[in-house]
Structures are given as C-alpha cells and as structure tokens.
C-alpha cells in the first residue's frame, strides 16, 4: 500500500511531482529504491541536480491588484533566455507574484530571516506558552514547533501555494523545474500595499487576489 509518508519521502529524495511519485510507487509495489530508479530513468528526478546550476536569466514579474492598491515585483531566475520567454515560465512567475500579493511573505527563504528576529519571536512564543500554563519542561519543544509554523507564514518558499495548499511554493517550483528542465530560483521580491503603515480601514486583499485567481 502506498502511503502519504512514502510519497513525501520519494518527493524529498527526487524532487519529482506528487502524482509522478504516486505512480512510481504503485508501479514498483511500494519499493522505495526501485521507485527512485524508475523516476530517474524517466528524467523526473533531475530537479535536485538542476538546483546546483547557475540561473542568471529570467524575468522580473510585475503584478498590480485592485486598481493599484497592491503591487508586487519579483525576480525569478532560470538558466536560459529561451526558457524565460516560454508561456510556462511566464505563468510560473505570475503565480509567484500573485502568491506574494495574497500571502504577504516577508522573506524568500528562512535563511534570510535575521537571527535577532527569530530570537525575538522565540521569546514571544515561549512567554505565550508559559502564560498558557504549559509545563516548562515541554515549552522549548512547543516553541520549536511554533517557530516552524512562523517560518511557513513569513517565508515565501515554505508557504502553502494559494492555488493548491497541499503543496508549498517550493514544491510547486520543484515540479516546474522537472517540467521545464532548468534550475529556477526566486531571488528577491518587493511588495507594496496602498497606505501600508497608516491608520486605515482593514481590507481583505488576500481574499480578493484569490477571487481573481479563481475566475
């Protein structure tokens, strides 16, 4: 029987898409090593190797939402100008820009989060746990679990993909790497929201972006 844990392990080992991993495990009767070989034979396990290649071409994608109330610029790199001009790559860049507009990440990846910000958040989470009456001996484990959730909120690549929350943005990009055949890297982004930091009424821009995606 093919389990979700088996599919997850195979995806982590090969970088192949979820459906490809399910098919490979079914084809090999759940034998993990044979499934890895099966994917490699079909060129579906190449994403991890491609990740080490230089990606210096690409696009700067712009997305404006709600009559100019939210604006996003994101630089997404690939290896060749040819791929950067393809419809699949352009669609990927647009999806990433809309993700940023809707989900408000602060960083691309967790390695970019300043150490002092992480320590400050851990202290807040620790105090919250203690105020909830949790035993001090388990507080540290709770903090580690909650800080992982925090990374999933503020780091673009760890966020659930808005079009398919069953996968992260990184997993979505990994699947695109396998399909397109080149390394793809989100280098940087900037997000502007009209009146950000000023006292104003609260707007649910995330829901508005999702409504536009689902049209």
From Swiss-Prot:
The keyword Transferase does not apply. CDD domains: UBA_EF-Ts (cd14275). It is found in: Cytoplasm. GO terms for cellular component: cytoplasm. It holds the Pfam family EF_TS. The keyword Transcription does not apply. Gene3D superfamilies: 1.10.286.20, DNA helicase RuvA subunit, C-terminal domain, Elongation factor Ts, dimerisation domain. Keywords: Cytoplasm, Elongation factor, Protein biosynthesis. Residues 80-83 are annotated as: Involved in Mg(2+) ion dislocation from EF-Tu. One of its GO terms (molecular function) is translation elongation factor activity. HAMAP family: EF_Ts. Belongs to the EF-Ts family. Associates with the EF-Tu.GDP complex and induces the exchange of GDP to GTP. It remains bound to the aminoacyl-tRNA.EF-Tu.GTP complex up to the GTP hydrolysis stage on the ribosome. This is Elongation factor Ts.
């Amino acid at each position: 029987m093919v389990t979700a844990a088996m599919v997850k392990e195979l995806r982590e080992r090969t970088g192949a898409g979820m459906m490809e991993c399910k098919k490979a495990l079914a084809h090999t009767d759940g034998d993990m090593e044979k499934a890895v070989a099966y994917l490699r034979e079909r060129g579906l396990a190449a994403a991890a190797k491609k990740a080490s290649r230089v990606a210096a071409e690409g696009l700067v994608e712009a997305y404006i939402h709600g009559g100019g109330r939210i604006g996003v610029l994101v630089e997404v790199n690939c290896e060749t100008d040819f791929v950067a001009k393809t419809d699949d790559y352009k669609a990927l860049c647009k999806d990433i820009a809309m993700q940023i507009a809707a989900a408000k990440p602060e960083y691309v990846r967790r390695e970019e989060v300043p150490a002092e910000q992480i320590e400050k958040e851990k202290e807040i989470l620790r105090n919250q746990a203690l105020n909830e009456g949790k035993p001090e001996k388990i507080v540290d484990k709770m903090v580690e679990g909650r800080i992982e959730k925090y990374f999933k909120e503020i780091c673009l690549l760890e966020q659930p993909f808005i079009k398919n929350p069953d996968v992260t943005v990184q997993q979505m990009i990994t699947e695109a790497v396998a399909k397109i055949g080149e390394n793809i890297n989100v280098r940087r982004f900037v997000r502007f929201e009209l009146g950000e930091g000023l006292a104003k009424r609260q707007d649910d821009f995330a829901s508005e972006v999702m409504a536009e995606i689902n049209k």
